[in-house]
Amino acid sequence: MKKWSRHLLAAGALALGMSAAHASDNDTLYFYNWTEYVPPGLLEQFTKETGIKVIYSTYESNETMYAKLKTYKDGAYDLVVPSTYYVDKMRKEGMIQKIDKSKLTNFHNLDPEMLNKP
């Protein structure tokens, strides 16, 4: 389970944060991700270890994810995991918030080969 936790945290660090709308709600993470992407029990384990409740929503295509995010107000989700080619599209449209790496205490554990890919 710990290996998956590290992978989830790494994915979270590399995923995009949609805004700081939920920033005052430090006990809840609004997470929008691919269907069947997270193993059963992992989010419950995350909550048990951190005390942070995860509100988990899923999508089956980038198009569905994108359309939903375009209709929602900024900050509907804290964490979204689109495919690489959609990240660039969303970046160009101002839909991505920069990640403050200084707040990621385990950032140094991420594989440098996976960072700053075009």
Stretches with model-predicted labels:
Residues M1-K2, Y32, S102, N116:
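Generic cytosolic/nucleocytoplasmic N-terminal low-complexity/intrinsically disordered segments
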Residues M1-L9:
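Bacterial N-terminal signal peptides that target proteins for export
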Residues H7-L8, A23, K98:
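Positively charged, low-complexity intrinsically disordered regions
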Residues L9-G17:
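Bacterial N-terminal signal peptides
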Residues A23-K89:
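Early extracytoplasmic/lumenal segment of secretory-pathway proteins
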Residues Y66, D88-P118:
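Hinge/lid segment of periplasmic solute-binding proteins
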